[in-house]
């Protein structure tokens, strides 16, 4: 089977009702990104940051995967699918995708404040545990913090993502502005002979001269059309 590698951004989950910090409305309107999505913001006011992510976790319990998520999972019948996502939700998992690389962390996990990427201190939260409190400790005795890659922090999974992109036969970009690095740079690792598709209702600057099939649609409609293009009807 061919290797199908999909890079998804906020537009993938927007149809499920998850607000992004680039959109008006929603949780992100109440706080500047610097307050709730940087290491400095966390050091300044850990309680504010922890409560902000508690609210995001609660929101995640109230939304469902959309048809786009489900269609990507269905493509596993025909392709070796790897989903590389900039999203921190678990909607790809809940839709049935089995191979996902989370570049920016996972909302459903918490970790050590001192050593965020030490696997011994990363904990998966059950749905009923969405609320983390000040004083909840990781295995090393530090405050449990969200397992999120904040602005200014390294992206440990980027090398894993590059390895999959370098082997792609088909590379698909869905719902990302390609403005956030290092994820935006993944396009440069796509092999020369691979097909590239871009699904987004808005124009996106891909910063490349290579040929790209553009589907100017939202995630669900775009993935539906992509499926028809990749698997023609008999």
UniProtKB/Swiss-Prot annotation:
Catalytic activity, as annotated: N(6)-acetyl-L-lysyl-[protein] + NAD(+) + H2O = 2''-O-acetyl-ADP-D-ribose + nicotinamide + L-lysyl-[protein]; N(6)-succinyl-L-lysyl-[protein] + NAD(+) + H2O = 2''-O-succinyl-ADP-D-ribose + nicotinamide + L-lysyl-[protein]
Species of provenance: Bacteroides thetaiotaomicron (strain ATCC 29148 / DSM 2079 / JCM 5827 / CCUG 10774 / NCTC 10582 / VPI-5482 / E50)
Example of a GO cellular component annotation carried by this entry: cytoplasm
Stored InterPro entries: DHS-like_NAD/FAD-binding_dom (IPR029035), NAD-dep_sirtuin_deacylases (IPR050134), Sirtuin (IPR003000), Sirtuin_cat_small_dom_sf (IPR026591), Sirtuin_class_III (IPR027546), Ssirtuin_cat_dom (IPR026590)
Family, as annotated: Belongs to the sirtuin family. Class III subfamily.
Keyword line: Cytoplasm, NAD, Transferase
Positions contributing to NAD(+) binding: 9-28, 86-89, 175-177
EC primary class: transferase
Molecular-function GO terms, alphabetical: histone deacetylase activity, NAD-dependent; NAD+ binding; protein-malonyllysine demalonylase activity; protein-succinyllysine desuccinylase activity
Pfam families found in the cross-reference section: SIR2
Enzyme nomenclature, EC number: 2.3.1.286
SUPFAM superfamilies associated with the record: DHS-like NAD/FAD-binding domain
Superkingdom of origin: Bacteria
Amino acids binding substrate: 53, 56
Comment field on protein domains: 2 residues (Tyr-53 and Arg-56) present in a large hydrophobic pocket are probably involved in substrate specificity. They are important for desuccinylation activity, but dispensable for deacetylation activity.
Gene name tied to this protein: cobB
Location in the cell: Cytoplasm
Residue ranges of domain Deacetylase sirtuin-type in the record: 1-234
Protein name: NAD-dependent protein deacylase
Biological role stated in the UniProt entry: NAD-dependent lysine deacetylase and desuccinylase that specifically removes acetyl and succinyl groups on target proteins. Modulates the activities of several proteins which are inactive in their acylated form.
Active site (UniProt): 104 (proton acceptor)
């Amino acid at each position: 089977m061919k290797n199908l590698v999909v890079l998804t951004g906020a537009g993938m989950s927007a149809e499920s009702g998850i607000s992004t910090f680039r959109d008006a409305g929603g949780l992100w309107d109440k706080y500047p990104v610097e307050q709730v999505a940087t290491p400095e913001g966390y050091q300044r006011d850990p309680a504010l940051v922890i409560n902000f992510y508690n609210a995001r976790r609660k929101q995640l319990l109230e939304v469902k995967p959309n048809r786009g998520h489900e269609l990507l999972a269905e493509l596993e019948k025909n392709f070796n699918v790897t989903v590389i996502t900039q999203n921190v939700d678990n909607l790809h998992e809940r839709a049935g995708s089995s191979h996902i690389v989370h570049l920016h962390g996972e909302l459903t996990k918490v970790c050590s404040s001192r050593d965020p990427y030490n696997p011994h201190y990363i904990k998966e939260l059950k749905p009923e545990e969405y609320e983390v409190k000040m004083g909840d400790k990781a295995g090393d005795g530090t405050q449990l913090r969200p397992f999120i890659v904040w602005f200014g922090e390294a992206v440990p999974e980027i090398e894993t993502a590059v390895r999959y992109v370098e082997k792609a036969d088909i590379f698909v970009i869905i719902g990302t502005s390609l403005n956030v690095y290092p994820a935006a740079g993944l396009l440069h690792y796509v092999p020369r002979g691979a097909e590239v598709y871009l699904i987004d209702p808005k124009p996106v600057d891909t910063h490349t001269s290579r040929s790209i099939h553009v589907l100017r649609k939202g995630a669900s409609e775009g993935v539906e059309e992509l499926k028809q293009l990749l698997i023609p009807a008999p």
